[in-house]
């Protein structure tokens, strides 16, 4: 199984084009992230009243929490144009210059995965963000000359899942940093209920709760699960999704009551059965699962760590008692030293 195909991956999938209709259009419709939403509303209202461009905004958080949706909402609330791109797409300074020179006054430019901008592109972006100017070098060698281009005052909205990879000069140019957190089950229930209404299918409170509990704190996953559960309900001639049909559908999709899928359980079972619960190195796990190390560290492990099933220790990955209980296995006797200093572990290389 390749990780992008997992129904519970927080990364965007090809079939997620169907979630566009489920996205809120205004801040008042956006569920969750209460403090971030309240602050954004104040900053937007203030910029609109002054007739100025909003300060540059940086959204930081795991994938699937609504960074792109919030960027679109910011532009809509400001009543300005919206242009979207991503860090890997902007290959050279000229690509960025083309985007910036086509922006109107106060427009929003959204750059997803902004941590993946090349250093050469970043250098061009600094004066654009700070002084609304482009400093470009035209030509090569002795004939090269510097050209300064004035830009319309715009708002750059950046999004990143890995804030630690941002350079300090780039991070410091964002006046409004916003960190997004995982959603509560109650918030996801509201999102699922609204989504069912948009999809024109009924849903009971316990049906919404069943989907929300397995959505791993992530609206994108909740929307994806809702669409698949709706298919099961339609096939069974059900006019509404209740707990029974939700449980049946999600079990058929191999998403268990804790939100773990077959890959998660395979990961935990491999450590439990083959390595006595650990510690085991990440390279060993990558080979055992036939998955790249990056996929292990960035896609599989974060949710398992968040739920308390896994520890990263200096000696390797280690299952917790919670993991053995979830797998229905007896926990082997282990030396306390395996857990690292005071039971906490640093990153194992």
Swiss-Prot record:
SUPFAM superfamilies the UniProt entry points to: P-loop containing nucleoside triphosphate hydrolases, Winged helix' DNA-binding domain
Q: Where is the stretch described as Head domain (RuvB-H)?
A: 257-349
Please write the reaction equations for the catalytic activity of this protein. ATP + H2O = ADP + phosphate + H(+)
Q: Which GO terms describe its cellular component?
A: cytoplasm; Holliday junction resolvase complex
**Which EC numbers does the record give?**
3.6.4.-
Residues holding ATP? 22-23, 64, 67-69, 130-132, 173, 183, 220
Where along the chain is Mg(2+) bound? 68
UniProt: DNA binding residues? 293, 312, 317
Q: Which InterPro entries match?
A: AAA+_ATPase, AAA_lid_4, DNA_helicase_Holl-junc_RuvB, P-loop_NTPase, RuvB-like_N, RuvB_C, WH-like_DNA-bd_sf, WH_DNA-bd_sf
Q: Which UniProt keywords apply?
A: ATP-binding, Cytoplasm, DNA damage, DNA recombination, DNA repair, DNA-binding, Hydrolase, Nucleotide-binding
User: Annotated region Large ATPase domain (RuvB-L): where?
Assistant: 1-183
Write out the annotated subcellular location: Cytoplasm
The family line of this record is:
Belongs to the RuvB family.
Share the domain note from the entry: Has 3 domains, the large (RuvB-L) and small ATPase (RuvB-S) domains and the C-terminal head (RuvB-H) domain. The head domain binds DNA, while the ATPase domains jointly bind ATP, ADP or are empty depending on the state of the subunit in the translocation cycle. During a single DNA translocation step the structure of each domain remains the same, but their relative positions change.
Protein name as it appears in the record? Holliday junction branch migration complex subunit RuvB
């Amino acid at each position: 199984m390749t990780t992008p195909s997992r129904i519970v991956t927080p990364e965007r999938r090809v079939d997620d084009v169907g979630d566009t209709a489920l996205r809120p259009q205004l801040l008042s419709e956006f569920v969750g992230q209460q403090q971030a939403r309240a602050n954004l509303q104040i900053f937007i209202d203030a910029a609109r009243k002054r007739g100025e461009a909003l300060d540059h905004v940086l959204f930081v958080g795991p994938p699937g929490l609504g960074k792109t949706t919030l960027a679109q909402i910011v532009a809509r609330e400001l009543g300005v144009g919206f242009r979207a791109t991503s860090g890997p797409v902007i290959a050279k300074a000229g690509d960025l210059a083309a985007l910036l020179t086509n922006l109107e006054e106060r427009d929003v430019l959204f750059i997803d995965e902004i941590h993946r901008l090349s250093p050469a592109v970043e250098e061009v972006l600094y004066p654009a963000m700070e002084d609304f100017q482009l400093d470009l070098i035209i030509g090569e060698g002795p004939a090269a000359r510097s050209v300064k281009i004035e830009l319309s005052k715009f708002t750059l909205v950046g999004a990143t899942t890995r804030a630690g990879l941002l350079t300090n000069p780039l991070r410091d140019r964002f006046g409004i940093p916003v960190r997004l957190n995982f959603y509560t089950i109650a918030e996801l229930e509201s999102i699922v209920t609204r989504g069912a209404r948009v999809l024109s299918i009924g849903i009971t409170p316990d049906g919404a709760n069943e989907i929300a509990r397995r959505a791993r704190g992530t609206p994108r996953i909740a929307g994806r699960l809702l669409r698949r559960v709706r298919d099961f309900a339609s096939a069974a001639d059900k006019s509404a999704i209740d707990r029974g049909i939700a449980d049946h559908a999600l079990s058929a999709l191999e998403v268990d009551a804790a939100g773990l899928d077959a890959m998660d359980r395979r990961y935990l079972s491999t450590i439990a059965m083959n390595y006595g619960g650990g510690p085991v190195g990440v390279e060993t796990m990558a080979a055992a699962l036939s998955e790249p190390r990056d996929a292990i560290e960035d896609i599989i492990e974060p949710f398992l760590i968040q739920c308390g099933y896994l520890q990263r220790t200096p000696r390797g990955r280690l299952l917790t008692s919670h993991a053995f209980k979830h797998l229905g296995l007896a926990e082997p006797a282990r030396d306390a030293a395996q857990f690292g200093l005071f039971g906490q572990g640093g990153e194992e290389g």
